[in-house]
Amino acid sequence: MSRDLFTSESVSEGHPDKIADQISDAVLDAILKQDKKARVACETYVKTGMVMVGGEITTDAWVDIEEITRNTVRNIGYTSSEMGFDADSCAILNVIGKQSPDINQGVDRSDPREQGAGDQGLMFGYATNETDVFMPAPITYAHHLVKRQAKVRKNKTLPWLRPDAKSQVTFAYDHGKIVGIDAVVLSTQHSEDIKQEDLVEAVMEEIIKPVLPAEWLSERTKYFINPTGRFVIGGPVGDCGLTGRKIIVDTYGGSARHGGGAFSGKDPSKVDRSAAYAARYVAKNIVAAGLADRCEIQVSYAIGVAEPTSISVETFGTEKVKKDLIIQLIREHFDLRPYGLIEMLNLIQPIYQSTAAYGHFGRNEFPWEALDKVEALKAGAF
């Protein structure tokens, strides 16, 4: 048996970069609740005792940036200086400006269907049938591990846990099929008073075993739990955090290509975000319809232009119909113009803060995960 290994990582909601992402998206959500036509590009920087919120925002809404920031940090769990960051005492700097009118004139149109892209760029969407959520297994289970860490921290099952954590899972494949998990890494911030051996046992029993399927674990599986032996200093004290620095964690864990644009803090007129969601929607429906076992979609745009400059499909030799037919079906059933995809996926709603931790894809509560095009694609293909 040949064994190919593939690894993906995730980070918890208390990781500094994810704190920044969640603040940026919390600001976006608050504005969208009041102004559906707002233009938002909100960036956040966090470091010891300080949060700086900046970017370009054009809106008629008024939101309390300080209150939004403190509530977000508090809900993550940073509530005392003992753990290195305190929602109630950190300094908050607001350096937000307005979006350039040069961009506005290229995006806004009298006919909204002709709305231009907010920038040039290329975006990818991906799906695979190796999990029931049509996502690669390594990133899926890496997310599950850090999500479980947050759960047992917040419900006090493991009260000595702190918000910052990272996971990494290496899967073994034989000719593209999962045959096991080769390695698991989980590093979690903790209080001073927990012994390393007690931490290792508790993490194994309360986080790893409840999450990872037993049939994929064996005596060959390697476990690395807090491998440095100590992780007391974490969060923004340990590292500064910036919006948009976890773009592979946010997407497919390296299993698919990435156009380079981050998501958090951007309203749906920014195709970096909305077109990446639409490309995932297209790829997932193609795989769910049985047109391919794996599918990667690339779309590209020019600033101020409505129609995509390109649509391409990669199926890695797993297609069940010709790729030309798949592209034809995409053009028939999916409107990938900026306004079209916003309408198609109902993107102008305050749903974005919850995307900002544990991945933007493979979570069925989001509209771009719907499988409502499957029957139409089947009818057109077979």
UniProtKB/Swiss-Prot annotation:
Its EC number is 2.5.1.6. SUPFAM superfamilies: S-adenosylmethionine synthetase. Gene3D superfamilies: 3.30.300.10. ATP binds at H15, D164, A165, K166, R230, F231, D239, R245, K246, A262, K266. One of its GO terms (molecular function) is ATP binding. It comes from the Bacteria. Catalyzes the formation of S-adenosylmethionine (AdoMet) from methionine and ATP. The overall synthetic reaction is composed of two sequential steps, AdoMet formation and the subsequent tripolyphosphate hydrolysis which occurs prior to release of AdoMet from the enzyme. Belongs to the AdoMet synthase family. This is S-adenosylmethionine synthase. The gene is metK.
